[in-house]
């Protein structure tokens, strides 16, 4: 891991690395395409585990995009965290990299992670649309209980 990425990861609550498992084209118009993206990956940081995601993404003619997603995270201790969110993407660069950002909310039944109930999160990261891989850095604004 490069110094830049390791210091970047240390600044954030979570780092999520995922791979696309399935894409479905939902709708095509003369100025956009809507696809469903299913991916799964690993979580490191505040807690460790895995994540499953279903994301509806609409890409416009100019390459910009908007997305909304549903995410299920399972920690290495078996705790489940559910999150929803939405955001935007810039047009891909010449290497197929899309810079994305977004925000959302999360919930869990875990007593240990109860401060995540109703917590807001923001994210930023990159998706490689050629490889179907994503790295996302998440910042969680935890609730006080």
Residue ranges of model-derived segments:
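Beta-strand-enriched cores of mature, soluble protein domains
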Residues: 2-145
């Amino acid at each position: 891991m490069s110094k830049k990425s390791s210091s970047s990861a240390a600044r954030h609550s979570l780092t999520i690395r995922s791979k696309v498992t399935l894409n479905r084209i939902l709708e095509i118009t003369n100025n956009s395409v809507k696809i469903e993206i299913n991916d799964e990956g690993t979580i490191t940081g505040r807690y460790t585990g895995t994540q499953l995601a279903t994301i509806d993404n609409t890409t416009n003619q100019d390459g910009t995009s908007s997305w909304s997603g549903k995410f299920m995270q399972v920690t290495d201790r078996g705790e489940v965290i559910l999150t929803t969110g939405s955001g935007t993407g810039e047009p891909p660069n010449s290497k197929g990299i899309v810079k994305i950002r977004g925000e959302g909310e999360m919930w869990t039944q875990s007593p240990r992670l109860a401060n995540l109930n109703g917590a807001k999160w923001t994210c930023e990261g990159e998706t490689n649309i050629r490889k179907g891989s994503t790295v996302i850095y998440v910042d969680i604004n935890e609730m006080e209980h």
